[in-house]
Amino acid sequence: PTAGVPFLLPLALLLAAASQPPGGDPPKEQGDTDLPRCPSPCACSLDDYSEELNVFCSARNLTRLPKDVPPNAKALWLDGNNFTLLPAAAFRNLSALDFLDLQSSQLASVEQHAFHGLRSLYHLHLERNRLRHLAPHTFLHTQNLISLSLNNNHFSKVEEGLFTGLSNLWYLNLGWNSLVVLPDKVFHDLPNLRELILAGNKLPYLQHQLFCSLTELKELDLSGNVLKGIKINIFVKLQKLQKLYLNHNQINAIAPRAFMGMKALRWLDLSHNRLVSLYEDTFLGLLSLHVLRLSTNSITSLRPRTFKDLQFLEELQLGHNRIRSLVERTFEGLGQVEVLSLNNNQLQDIKAEAFLGLYNVAVMHLSDNCIKVLPDFVFKGVTKLHSLHLEQSCMGRIQANTFSGLSSLRRLFLQHNSISFIEDQSFSELNELLELDLKHNRLSHLSPRLFVGLSNLEYLFLSYNQLLEISQDTFSPLRRLFWLDLSHNQLETMDNTVISPLTNLRYLSLRNNSLETFSVGFLCPPFTLEQLWLAGNNWHCNCSLKGLRDFSLQYPVVMPRFVQSVAEGDDTQLPMYTYNNLTCQHPPALAGLDLRDTTEESFAHC
């Protein structure tokens, strides 16, 4: 090894000499770079990985474009300034620039050749300015542009030829202007456009030629205009379109076969319009549609076979309409639908086979109608339903076979109705049910066989009814019950044997009833109960409550005097307190005193 040293030493000296610059100047320290001078008052940064120069001039209160922007700049931020005018050839030396942000800069005028020299530009932001007009060929010098944002300006029209040269454009946003009409051929120079946003304008109609050249378009947003109707062949060339937004217009009619040719469409939003009727061929040709939103219209009825071609539809929104009835086979052909919303209609009559064919529906919203009585076996064939919403639907009674066939149901919402009677074993086939909500009804009695079959039920809400008593075996089938709310009823007694079968109970509320006494005999250690709420009853603080007094003092976590809570995600609101007072009503000597604050002497004779 030592024999190699004489050879390596001259080589090292030779390399060291070669590294000295001419004239004997010392070498640059590691980390020195040739950063171009940054224009005042901007900030510049050089990406260590790509060596791309970024120039940041945002919100500098500039009235003129900064001078001497380095010619190798790749990105230039000029947003939030006060330019007013963009002169011709303003960026003529920035041929390397690929990103230019001029949004929110008070721009009112852009001269025709303002973007001359920007041959490498990919992204241009001109949104949120005061632009009313752009001359034809304004973007002729930016032929590599991929995205162009012109939204939130004051355009009332767009000149034909404005987009000449933008054959590579993928994204164009003209939303939230004041556009009243568009030239027939305004988009004919954009053969590669993928996303077009025209939302929030004042367009009253669409011409047949308007979208003919946009054969690559995947997303079209026309929401928030004043469109009155959809004619045939408007979208016929958009065979690759996947999402179409027509919501928040004034559409009152759709021509038959209006969506023919749109074989790739997956999402169609027609909500918040004025549609009254749908026809058998309204949605003809939409073979790939997954989501159809028709909520908040004025639809009064649904004809059979209206949706027959939508074999891949997964979500159908029909809420907030005026539908009065559902006839047999209304939803035939919708074998893949998972979510069906019919809430906030005027439904009074649902035929027994109305839901036939909905083999995969998992969530069904029928709330806020006036159904009153559902026919027997109405949900026959809807075997995969997980959640059924029937709250606020004027229902007065539940029949024995109303929910027959719903073997997969997990959640059943029946709150805020007028239910006064439920036939025995009405829930007997709901073996997978986890949550049953019956609060805010008119139940005064629970049959001993009412909950037969609900062996997996975990949550039962019975608050705000008119219950006077509960018989011994009523809750016996509910072996897995976790949460039981019986608050705001008229219960005068609660026998130990009613609660004792509930061996998994964690939460029990009997607040605001008429209980005078309460036995904790069912709470033999080790018990599972974590919270017991008994406030708002007519407690007679005598020997019959000594057990409750001792338990509440021994287990204050189970019977807290209050619980503090804060609205989730909002730290600014004051905390809310839920109190669990055990206020004595009798005898007079203890009236007004909390049971837990009474002395041992009060119960010495027990």
Language-model segments: residues:
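LRR N-terminal entry segment and analogous cap-like coil->beta motifs
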Residues: 49-99, 103-106
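Leucine-rich repeat
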Residues: 49, 63, 69-72, 84, 92-97, 108, 116-121, 132, ...
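Recurring C-terminal helix/loop segment of individual leucine-rich repeat
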Residues: 64-68, 88-92, 110-116, 136-140, ...
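Consensus "Asn ladder" position of solenoid repeat domains
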Residues: 60, 81, 102-105, 126-129, ...
